[in-house]
Swiss-Prot record:
InterPro entries for the chain: Ribo_uL30_ferredoxin-like_sf, Ribosomal_uL30_bac-type, Ribosomal_uL30_CS, Ribosomal_uL30_ferredoxin-like
Coiled coil segments of this chain: none
Domain of life: Bacteria
Source lineage: Bacteria, Bacillati, Bacillota, Clostridia, Natranaerobiales
Molecular function as annotated in GO: structural constituent of ribosome
Name listed for the protein in its UniProt record: Large ribosomal subunit protein uL30
One Pfam family recorded for the sequence: Ribosomal_L30
Family per similarity comment: Belongs to the universal ribosomal protein uL30 family.
GO cellular component: cytosolic large ribosomal subunit
Swiss-Prot/TrEMBL keywords: Ribonucleoprotein, Ribosomal protein
Amino acid sequence: MADKKLKVTLKRGLIGVSDGKIRTIKALGLKKRSHSVIKNDTPEIRGMIDKVSNLVEVEELEA
């Protein structure tokens, strides 16, 4: 499972978003709208993505 990668892109701005979700977005390494990061596909990252699923777009990449 760890050999897969996820491309996570922030699709919405953070104005009006709860503090917990903002901290999760920052922990994923996202900074601004349309910013993307590549993360390993782990259960921890999947849980973070599920928490902010309305704010991000996820693409699966093969490593």
